Amino acid sequence: MADEMARLEAVVRGRVQGVGFRYLVLDFATDIGLTGWVANERDGSLRCEAEGKRANLERLLDLLERGPSGSRVTHVEHSWSEATGRFAAFSVRSGHHLGD
């Protein structure tokens, strides 16, 4: 099951913008071979969609729950589904916050 390909969608709430969160996620996801994207949302949250091995996605979820220093994660909503294969790489999408 750990090698099973899956998709993780997550919304991270709290003090998560302006603290380098997106670039931490980008570096981590790229290092462990995930594809997808991360972006800031207008409501102050951070949204992430990622695909890859389930075990690596669980590692990403753990990172999302902790956040970088300077952040304060209060809640992570997440869901699992089958991988679609639609992403070629992991990227930071233009968000609605200009702080990082």
Enumerate the predicted regions with their spans.
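Intrinsically disordered, low-complexity, mixed-charge
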Residues: M1-D100
